[in-house]
Amino acid sequence: SIAASVLVLAVRSLGGLQPAELRAYDRLLQQRLPNTTPERLLVIEATEADINRYGYPLPDAVLAQVIERLQPYEPRLIGLDIFRDRPEANSPLAPLLAEQDNLVGLCSGRLGQGDGIAPPPSLPTERLGFSNVVEDHDGVMRRHLLFMTPEVDDPCATEFSLSARLAIQYLDVEGIAPQILPDEQLQLGRAQFAPLQSHSGPYHNLDHWGFQVWLNYADTETFVQQISVSDLLTQNIDLESLENHIVLIGMSAPVSNPTDFFLTPAGANQWPRQQTEGVLLHAQMVNHLLTAALDGQSPIRVWPVGVELVWIAAWCGLGGLVGWRWRRLSMAVIAAGGSVLLLYGIAWGLLNLSWWVPLVPAAIGATLATVGTFASA
């Protein structure tokens, strides 16, 4: 048991188990119990059919029509998830961006060798959010970048992501303001968000720049309504009141705009892999913040490193006990399998309570301890 614990912890400390731990997390995430999400989001998406109809990039006049079509329904906020760094001459969109207080626009921060993308010139900084996201080495979006400090000459001079800007302005109407606590956690309404560190959960030597947290996904089929640009502008769609809604306007055109698609844990578990359009990813991020702040849906949390070590060692001890207790091979195999199933059930149950626990290292350690103890005896 001791040898199994040392071996597993050594391999894990070097990051050798990170890919398997992340894949196990993806699987557990998809198996969680369904959760209900209040209707607060609407996505207006420019589909491939819309691009064929109106052109690419979507003209300012069309975007202005979309915004003006929405305003009578009094949405609390409109987030424009489309870059507009090069305004058209006599653009009807420019005065809307300058004057409509419920309109939030987009830019892209300068990272690494990139140049960044400037915001619309007429948009005030206090209604601006960056589009930058963080993905893991396997390309899957498991983390949520809320804030980052822009460089001095960055054309995207905002510390807020688009999702954080929209959520915080939405919550401001509810009388909720963000607070940074002494332990550097973010207090947002009923929720506290702990920033990821270099060794958080399955991550080892994580580049945790900015303020990153786990992204707690909602059920993809139920959390947001989607309407195409053409349907909004040409059909008699009754949106009723959007008073308590955030409307996101973005692209959903994989041929015309292929770079704005991302791999989520749900898509990574399908074959072939299914990517999600960027506007829906931003909607997931906004929903993540609002459901935590308003509905008490806890952000995903991890144990301190010391508690994880005790957890893994305990399962190694249980595996050793199984190998010592059952001397018939068939019984030892059944008992070891039952232990792993019990471990999986506990990990699943805790993730439903928004706690991630080390499933893979505990399962490997328990199995190695069972085999080693059985063989030595």
PLM regions and their residue ranges:
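Short, well-ordered loop/turn and helix-capping segments at boundaries between secondary-structure elements
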Residues: T291-D295, A347, A369, T373
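Non-transmembrane functional regions of envelope-associated proteins
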Residues: S1-H199, L242-R328
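Juxtamembrane or sensor-core-proximal signal-transducing alpha helices
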Residues: V360-A377
